[in-house]
């Protein structure tokens, strides 16, 4: 429903596209998609997914989300899913994403307070329920290694989406709003997953 706000034939940047789920959804809506990721492996998975589903007009680009290789005002919309939380300089990323948006363009960020529980007692108290409700399983992954990495990331210490709203407002976004996202039947008193929508 969020992406139906984007007019058809718009140019959209899917930053941190991963295996291409959002790119596929955006392409299916008739949008001109550029799928960007820092990982060549993820770009290959995204290409495979789009090609298998018959979308051969998507552009792919290896890019650092914090230093984009695109000209100013290149896109009508920028979308991101589960990326901002693991960036070393998320403020720089937001500045870049607004830079490549056309005036009036929209930014859609879907993210979460994935590692707040490492620093925040309230989040630590609900983490078992969060894992249960989201079927959060990392098969074959040493979670202690991930936790060690997350401890060094700036947004692991921030409660969001308030942080996102504040930084986007400081970066002069024309409009910013956030919505907490819940799984069916989930009732968290703290924001775990959320969407941030901004207009340049």
Q: Which ranges hold each PLM region?
A:
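A short acidic, Gly/Pro-enriched loop at the edge of an enzyme's catalytic core
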Residues: 66-77
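Short alpha-helix
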Residues: 154-172
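A short glycine-rich, Lys/Arg-flanked "PGG" loop and its adjoining helix->strand segment in the class I
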Residues: 91-103
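Conserved S-adenosyl-L-methionine
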Residues: 173-185
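Conserved alpha-helix/loop element of class I SAM-dependent methyltransferases that forms part
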Residues: 1-8
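Class I SAM-dependent methyltransferase SAM/SAH-binding core
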Residues: 11-15, 19-67
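Conserved class I S-adenosyl-L-methionine
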Residues: 106-140
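A short SAM/SAH-binding and catalytic strip from SAM-dependent methyltransferases
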Residues: 77-90
